[in-house]
Structures are given as C-alpha cells and as structure tokens.
Amino acid sequence: MTDENRSIVKQGLSFLNQSCPIQIKALLNQAGYNNTINEETVGFIIGPRLNAVGRLEDASLAAELLMTEDEEEAEFLAEQVEHFNVERKEIVAQITDEALAIAEEKVNNGNQFLLLAKENWHEGVLGIVASKIVETYALPTLILNIDLEQNHAKGSARSIEQVSMFEILSAHQDLISKFGGHHMAAGMTMEIDYIEALEQGLNDWMFKLSEHTSLEPTKHVSVKLEENDISINNIRDIQRLSPFGTDFEKPLLEIDDNEVVDVR
C-alpha cells in the first residue's frame, strides 16, 4: 500500500462510499454490511465473496454480477455468490480441521516445515488453509491435494517472515514439476513419488536456517503509549492515515503495566 497504489485505493474507497455501484451494494447487502467501506471491507468482505466463485467453480458468475446494470439482477446474482461463499467457508473449515490434525503430529515430531498432503482436498482453497496453519504454528506450510489418477499433487504454500518460500522451493526444484510465487506464498505441482523426499529436503533446509536465525514469531511495535495518549483525537489521527495494507500496516500500539478488565 505505497506510492500510486495507495492513491488509487484511497480514491477507490472514496468513490465506493460516495456512489456505491449496485453490484457492490448487492454483495454488501448479502453480507449484512451497511457501514463505511474501507480497505478491510474490500479485503475481507467484498474480495473473498467474488473469489469464492472462482475458487470452487467458474468465475463467470462473479463477472456477470460485476457487469450487470440491473439492480434486481444484481441482487439475484449476489445471492448466488453468497451461496458459493458459504460453501467455500464450509470446505475450508473441513480441510483445516483435517490439516491441523496432521500438522499437530508433525510438529510433535519436530518438523519445522509443514508439508501436509491428502486426497480429495479442494485445490481452490488450499492457500486459505495454508494461511490458517501458519497462523496456528508460525511455520512455513505447504498444503497439497493428491490426485492418484494423474499421479501428481497440487497445492499452495504460505510462509513466515524469516523464510522466503520462493527461495526454499527453488532450492528443491528438481523435485517439483512447476511452481511460482514470491517471498510469502507459492503455488506448485509435483509428482506424488517425490513428496516424501521434498518434505525431508524442506525440513533439512529449515534446520540449517534455524541454527543462525530465530524462527520465533515477531511483532513490530510502532509506538509505546501512556494512558493519557489514548484519546478520540489520536484515534481519529490514526484513522486519517488509512488505507493500511502491505508495506503500510496498521500501527501496533503497546501499553505496559495495565490490567485487562474487560474484552469485547
């Protein structure tokens, strides 16, 4: 969220709030959302619903919704999109439960890179599942669906700040049919016969890295506050800095020596 991207997002959010298109309004109606549209609305409400269609089937329904100019049709199509989103959540929950069970065993065995593979996992949601595993264990994770008929495994990987997923997969590309990605994420296809060797290689790589690099999760505190720093004016000043996103994260504030009385 830097440079011209930041300017484009800010103008886009302003437009959505001043004159929200019927297509987006229909999506938000289905989600039961009627507040100010900000970057989190786009990232966690609008985006996932549009993506859900393409993840599970063909994205043409989402495209049809975005192109319609009829309000009644927009509501009808948005309702269908919402059904896909509900189904996507159910599939993610099921696969995540299965993946967490496998991950727990591997973590207990000392694995520092989690390669989780199983048949009949929907490939369209494996990136989401991988992110949830990373959130739980703070370890780089690769989730693969095994296709016995095609004799290959296909899936998505998510990483942690200290580990470049692109670098670690590049170091083992002789075991991978094809892959692409960046520091924090990747997608890949490989032959089933190489899964065990890849898992061993990735963990060996991680063990060498851990000899000189801490893999502990880190938090970067933006500023430490005193109690008298907490005011409506300061909160509004922080909000004026939005939109937040990659490379311009929402500030993390630290307050020491305070007792938590209530959580809502």
Predicted feature residues:
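A contiguous loop/helix-start segment that scaffolds small-molecule binding in enzyme catalytic cores
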Residues: L13, P21, D204-R264
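Short amphipathic alpha-helices in soluble, non-transmembrane regions
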Residues: L169-Q173, E199-M206
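Conserved strand-to-helix beginnings and helix N-cap segments that scaffold or border functional pockets
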Residues: A59, L126-I128, E199, I232-I235
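Hydrophobic helix-and-loop "lid/oligomerization" segment in the mid-to-C-terminal part
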Residues: M1-D193
